[in-house]
Swiss-Prot record:
Name of this chain's protein: Translation initiation factor 1A
PANTHER family assigned: EIF-1A
Gene: eif1a
UniProt signal peptide: none
Species: Methanococcoides burtonii (strain DSM 6242 / NBRC 107633 / OCM 468 / ACE-M)
GO molecular function terms noted in the UniProt entry: RNA binding; translation initiation factor activity
HAMAP family reported in the protein's UniProt record: aIF_1A
Cited InterPro entries: NA-bd_OB-fold (IPR012340), RNA-binding_domain_S1_IF1 (IPR006196), TIF_eIF-1A (IPR001253), TIF_eIF-1A_CS (IPR018104)
């Protein structure tokens, strides 16, 4: 008999990847890896364009999106300061595997 887990899906069942959000170049979005947590809402990011940026997690996403070191995220660099960026999306493990298979991650 299956254990009652409060109406939530089991953590062991990985959902099948149906569609993965990819970075949109027209919106100036870039893939990045979280290299360090700085505290508060700030992280250090190693971006796919070779630049190390300081990222900020917006307050609307802070509680919903728990970011750890090594996570793959989508960022948008600031218009007026290229060394800083906003974190707008975090990928799950199956989505990261899909990105690696399709060649988005190097």
């Amino acid at each position: 008999m299956k254990k009652n887990n409060g109406g939530r899906g089991s953590k062991t069942d990985a959902p099948a990847v149906t569609r993965v959000r990819t970075p949109r170049r027209e919106n100036n979005e870039i893939l990045a890896t979280v290299s360090a947590l700085l505290g508060g809402k700030r992280v250090t990011l190693q971006c796919m364009d070779g630049i190390v940026r300081m990222g900020r997690i917006p307050g609307s996403k802070k509680k919903r999106m728990w970011v750890r070191e090594g996570d793959i995220v989508i960022i948008t660099p600031w218009d007026f300061q290229d060394s800083k960026a906003e974190v707008i999306w975090k990928y799950t493990r199956p989505q990261v595997e899909w990105l690696e298979r399709k060649g988005f991650l190097k």
